[in-house]
């Protein structure tokens, strides 16, 4: 086909050709197995009413299964471990599966969070009772020590469970690594005491302070705190070069202050309060940071002016220039970048939340559609059951009336035969015409009585008895060479009225099916109006139901679709040629 369309190849046409080959190879494979193509869906098999019909009529047909993947929001490691073949085939579940189940449970998470808050309270009480020598408080101190050890052991057990669940995944998570180092720093002072180090050692006191870091474990427990910390880290990453430039200016102004304020730092004048601020590089860096925060800048400047050896002009230029660069320019830039980063993160989070909200609304809407369809099917089933009962009742009643009508029709036929035998002249023919009209009126009256008897209040679509009622029976051959056209038209009109009375249109048709009038009305509608009227019904339809095309139609569809791609490509080239021709025409 590519050679027929041209010597060029199209990716879309090749994709359609491959789809055609794959589809027909699958069909041939299915035909080789069962000599049939799947014509039924899983929903039809699960429907009890339709299933009974299929099992009684065609039991060898294939069923098309539509598999719906269950998308979960968060797949835990324990769930992944449970789906592994080695775990599913093992006789006993592994300990890692049990550890993951414990870590994922909400009870264990709430227990760890309560221990973190309890640790904060215990440390607060220990600090208050540290210097107390009251012997009555020894039981309280012992209880606090036991609580401290219990909290520490609980944190260690949590880390061991994480290692047991997945040792490699533990070190890949930054929050788990942070939690591990916080627990290790709080464990070190207890280990040092067990090794025999004096309790009044300076290093031991510093390590005991690390127990306060256990409160930082809350960062890894609450999602909102994680978002704030991640926003800060992201903002600092974007301000890396700005902070480097700010540190360079810090260093320049600190070195300049040490060099130019030597006389002020070495002055022996009494009453100087800040003469040590520029004594060395570290003090100068601290002083520059103080000026950066606009703290005591005017008091420092006035204290420098007290020394005659220091230049007032240079000291004023130094302080004002640093205030302009550091306090006004750099600080405002840092604040602006922080606000911008937080706004970007907030917009991303709001977009994600809106997406989740839309997904939730879509799921709820789909669930409502399913419930509505199930409710409508249940109502339709009950209504059809009532209609079937009414049809059975009316059919029994109509059979009795049909027997009476047949007897009347036989008597009428005998009368007609006798009248035909006695016809001799025009007068007799006129009298025969009048008798035939009377006989027709007598035939119509039983039909009216039959309609009243068989359908007193209820009517049922698609149920008629043309063989028994004989509404079209008029015997034109026997009569009536002189019967006028007006009389025939009047007789046909009476017949139509009798039909309408015998078979009235039911209200149940509009609720359970489509009538001929509705069909004619829909045919006159335009496409857009038809789509808008049937859109609720289309939305209620199950999207998983598939229509199986015939083999020749499917092949023709793919063939035409492939030709369409080549036609579109030729149309595109012709448009390009036309554009070039118009451009050359304008140039000339």
Swiss-Prot record:
Residues 440-502 have a biased composition (Basic and acidic residues). It catalyses: Ca(2+)(in) = Ca(2+)(out). Its main location: membrane. It comes from the Eukaryota. Testis-specific. The keyword Transcription does not apply. Residues 1-106, 165-173, 221-237, 340-588 are cytoplasmic. One of its GO terms (molecular function) is calcium-activated cation channel activity. Belongs to the cation channel sperm-associated (TC 1.A.1.19) family. Pore-forming subunit of the CatSper complex, a sperm-specific voltage-gated calcium channel that plays a central role in sperm cell hyperactivation. Controls calcium entry to mediate the hyperactivated motility, a step needed for sperm motility which is essential late in the preparation of sperm for fertilization. This is Cation channel sperm-associated protein 2. It comes from Mus musculus (Mouse). The gene is Catsper2.
């Amino acid at each position: 086909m590519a050679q027929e369309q041209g010597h060029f190849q199209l990716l879309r046409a090749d994709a359609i050709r491959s789809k055609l080959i794959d589809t027909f190879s699958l069909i041939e494979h299915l035909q080789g197995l069962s000599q049939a193509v799947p014509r039924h869906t899983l929903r039809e098999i699960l429907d009890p009413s339709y299933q009974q019909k299929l099992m009684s009529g065609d039991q060898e047909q294939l069923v098309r299964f539509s598999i719906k993947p269950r998308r979960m929001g968060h797949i835990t490691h324990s769930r992944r471990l449970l789906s592994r073949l080695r775990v599913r085939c093992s006789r006993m579940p592994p300990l890692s599966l049990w550890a993951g189940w414990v870590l994922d449970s909400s009870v264990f998470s709430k227990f760890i969070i309560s221990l973190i808050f309890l640790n904060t309270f215990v440390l607060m009480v220990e600090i208050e009772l540290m210097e107390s020598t009251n012997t009555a408080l020894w039981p309280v101190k012992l209880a606090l020590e036991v609580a401290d050890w219990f909290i520490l052991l609980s944190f260690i057990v949590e880390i061991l469970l994480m290692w047991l669940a997945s040792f490699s995944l533990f070190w890949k998570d930054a929050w788990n690594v942070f939690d591990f180092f916080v627990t290790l720093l709080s464990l070190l002072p207890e280990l040092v005491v067990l090794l025999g180090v004096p309790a009044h050692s300076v290093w031991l006191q510093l390590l005991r302070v690390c127990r306060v870091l256990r409160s930082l474990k809350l960062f890894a427990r609450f999602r909102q705190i994680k978002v704030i910390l991640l926003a800060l880290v992201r903002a600092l990453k974007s301000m890396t070069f700005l902070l480097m430039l700010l540190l360079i200016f810090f260093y320049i102004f600190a070195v300049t202050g040490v060099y130019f304020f030597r006389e002020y730092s070495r002055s022996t004048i009494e009453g100087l309060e800040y003469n040590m601020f520029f004594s060395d590089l570290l003090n100068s860096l601290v002083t520059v940071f103080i000026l950066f925060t606009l703290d005591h800048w005017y008091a420092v400047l006035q204290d420098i002016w007290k020394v005659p050896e220091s230049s007032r002009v240079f000291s004023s230029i130094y302080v004002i220039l640093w205030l302009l660069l550091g306090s006004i320019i750099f600080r405002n830039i840092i604040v602006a970048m922080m606000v911008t980063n937080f706004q970007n993160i907030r917009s991303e989070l709001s977009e994600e939340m809106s997406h989740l909200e839309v997904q939730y609304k879509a799921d709820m809407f789909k669930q409502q559609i399913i419930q509505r369809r199930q409710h409508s099917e249940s109502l339709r089933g009950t209504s059809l059951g009532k209609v079937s009962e009414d049809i059975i009742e009316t059919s029994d009643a109509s059979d009795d009336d049909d027997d009476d009508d047949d007897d009347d029709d036989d008597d009428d036929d005998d009368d007609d035969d006798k009248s035909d035998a006695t016809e001799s002249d025009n007068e007799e023919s006129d009298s025969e015409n009048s008798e035939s009209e009377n006989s027709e009126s007598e035939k119509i009256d039983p039909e009216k009585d039959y309609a009243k008897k068989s359908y007193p209040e209820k009517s049922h679509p698609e149920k008629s008895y043309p063989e028994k009622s004989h509404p079209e029976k008029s015997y034109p051959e026997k009569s009536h060479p002189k019967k006028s056209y007006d009389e025939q038209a009047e007789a046909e009109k009476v017949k139509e009225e009798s039909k309408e009375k015998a078979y009235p249109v039911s209200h149940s048709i509009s609720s359970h099916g489509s009538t001929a009038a509705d069909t004619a009305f829909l045919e006159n509608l335009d496409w857009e109006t038809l789509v808008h009227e049937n859109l609720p019904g289309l939305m209620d339809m199950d999207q998983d139901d598939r229509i199986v095309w015939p083999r020749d139609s499917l092949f023709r569809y793919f063939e035409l679709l492939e030709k369409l791609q080549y036609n579109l490509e030729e149309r595109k080239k012709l448009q390009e040629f036309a554009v070039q021709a118009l451009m050359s025409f304008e140039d000339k």
